[in-house]
């Protein structure tokens, strides 16, 4: 078995990924609507795709169902995945599996290119795929791979960009330089932080190697020109987003940093103790895998001089970049695990660096039986990782603590259409503290409790064109804010979702 694995690592890699997908119930999850952790942000993503489909708008005119501002028009990350998903709806119908599937394809692409990168530093073997399996089975990385958010696609495209720039470094091929630049541009457009770390760290290493006369001025100049182009693309999109949101008076998407110095000491300690080392820790990986990462970090430090010169320096810049990011976005770590996804990049490269050292410096010196034993240990760790991922995915998708709104909202749209409520009719939806969870579920534009604060007024929404009030919690039927508008009941679903005519 181990001999076959060493001879066919890429087959084994995607076999393990397929096993991970099946064991973690990916066959069902891929068709789930937004749910569980960060249903709010997931629904925003779905809302972008659905409105592209329904409005037929262009790539540069994104909007959501929430009518804050002008007709719901608002932008954030480059919406190419939502745009592609919205257009695929025209051919295959509106299915959540299309959007989740696009993200998962990006995840697979990233796995493939990371495998290709590692192949440039060590011969193809079981050791080569081990770091990738640990990344692929990280529960929170996998959770967002089979999801709607753009973080994992951004990281995946940056792995592709890195591979092509590494090939350029070895061959001076302009074709590979251009392809890598395109991948890095797309990665940073999706997420400037998650998609940009790998590119910036590589540029830093290349610059140092140039100072040591390991590269020509022409190569450095070409890389700098491409980096300026990537930076220009990011700046151009950021400038457009600010202009677009200002034009449409919609600033629901935050575009700034969340630095640690905005927090008081008590809150900082809470994030460290209760979130990073508490609530979130189980979703990073199984404890034994985290201990293994700690061991790799220790070896990375004490065996520094023996490590691959490029990998040790590149990994160092990844660590420094991630630490800088953590300081600048630390406030978000309290409630958002996806803000921490960037940290998987230095983590996996620490493992890659140490594994390459083992492969080139340690294994050739030990008996074959010990190598065999190491292979068994690696397969065992992979099995533990797959099992932990399955458990976390099951918990996230089944536990009531992750249910934020009435789950029946995703079954209501056919009822609305039977009642004569058109997809274009404006509604008021409550309760819903998010901009788009219920609106995206009902597939109707309108207003929620989000971004209204003291201006929340059903009568005002009715004057703006809202025709119906949909309440998905019986307790809200008795709230003074809604009682005057619950006179014309025109339909209900499962005795917990009520539809009222506001006209």
Segments (PLM) and residue ranges:
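Hydrophobic/aromatic-rich transmembrane helices and adjacent perimembrane loops
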Residues: 151, 190, 196, 322, ...
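Membrane-interface transmembrane helices that cradle and orient dolichyl/undecaprenyl
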Residues: 119-125, 161-177, 187
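Signature aromatic-anchored transmembrane alpha helix within multi-pass, membrane-resident enzymes
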Residues: 15-16, 182, 203, 224-229, ...
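Transmembrane-helix motifs of polytopic, lipid-linked glycan transferases
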Residues: 98-122, 159-164, 302
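Membrane-proximal, lumen/periplasm-facing interface regions of secretory-pathway glyco-
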Residues: 35-36, 337, 368-419, 433-441
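Short acidic/glycine- and proline-prone juxtamembrane loop motifs at membrane-interface regions
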Residues: 143-154
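Transmembrane-lumen/periplasm boundary regions of multi-pass, lipid-linked membrane glycan transferases
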Residues: 44-51, 55, 198-310, 323-333, ...
């Amino acid at each position: 078995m181990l001999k076959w694995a060493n001879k066919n690592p890429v087959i084994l890699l995607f076999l393990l990924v397929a096993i991970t997908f099946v064991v973690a119930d990916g066959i069902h999850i891929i068709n789930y609507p937004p749910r569980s952790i960060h249903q709010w942000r997931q629904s925003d993503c779905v809302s972008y795709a659905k409105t592209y489909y329904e409005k037929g708008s262009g790539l540069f005119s994104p909007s959501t169902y929430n009518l804050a501002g002008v007709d719901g028009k608002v932008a954030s990350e480059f919406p190419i995945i939502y745009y592609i998903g919205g257009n695929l709806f025209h051919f295959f119908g509106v299915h959540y599996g299309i959007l989740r599937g696009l993200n998962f394809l990006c995840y697979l692409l990233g796995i493939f290119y990371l495998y290709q990168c590692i192949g440039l530093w060590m011969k193809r073997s079981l050791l080569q795929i081990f770091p990738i399996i640990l990344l692929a089975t990280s529960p929170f990385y996998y959770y967002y791979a089979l999801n709607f958010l753009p973080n994992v696609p951004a990281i995946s495209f940056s792995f592709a960009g890195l591979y092509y720039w590494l090939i350029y470094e070895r061959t001076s091929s302009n074709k590979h330089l251009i392809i890598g630049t395109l991948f890095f541009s797309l990665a940073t457009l999706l997420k400037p932080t998650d998609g940009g770390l790998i590119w910036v760290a590589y540029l830093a290493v290349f610059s140092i190697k140039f100072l040591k006369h390991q590269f020509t001025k022409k190569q450095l100049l070409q890389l700098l020109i491409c980096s300026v182009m990537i930076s220009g693309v990011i700046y151009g999109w950021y400038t457009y987003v600010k202009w677009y949101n200002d034009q449409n008076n919609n600033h629901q998407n935050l575009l700034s940093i969340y630095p640690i110095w905005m927090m008081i000491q008590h809150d900082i300690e809470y994030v460290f103790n209760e979130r990073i080392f508490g609530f979130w820790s189980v979703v990073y990986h199984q404890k034994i895998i985290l201990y293994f990462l700690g061991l790799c970090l220790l070896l990375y430090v004490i065996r520094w001089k023996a490590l691959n010169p490029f990998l040790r320096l590149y990994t160092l810049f990844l660590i420094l970049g991630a630490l800088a990011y953590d300081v600048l976005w630390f406030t978000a770590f309290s409630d958002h695990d996806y803000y921490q996804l960037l940290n998987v990049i230095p983590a996996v490269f620490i493992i890659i660096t140490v594994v390459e050292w083992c492969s080139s410096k340690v294994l050739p010196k030990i008996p074959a039986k010990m190598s065999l034993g190491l292979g068994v240990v690696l397969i065992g760790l992979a099995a533990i990782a797959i099992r932990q991922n399955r458990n976390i995915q099951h918990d996230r998708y089944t536990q009531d603590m992750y249910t934020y709104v009435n789950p029946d909202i995703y079954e209501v749209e056919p009822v609305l259409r039977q009642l004569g409520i058109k997809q274009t009719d404006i509604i008021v939806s409550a309760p819903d503290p998010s901009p788009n969870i219920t609106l995206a579920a009902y597939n109707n534009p309108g207003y929620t409790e989000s971004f209204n604060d003291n201006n929340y007024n059903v009568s005002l929404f009715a004057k703006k064109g809202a025709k119906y009030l949909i309440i998905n919690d019986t307790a809200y039927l008795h709230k003074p804010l809604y009682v005057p508008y619950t006179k014309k009941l025109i339909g209900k679903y499962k005795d917990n979702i009520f539809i009222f005519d506001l006209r």
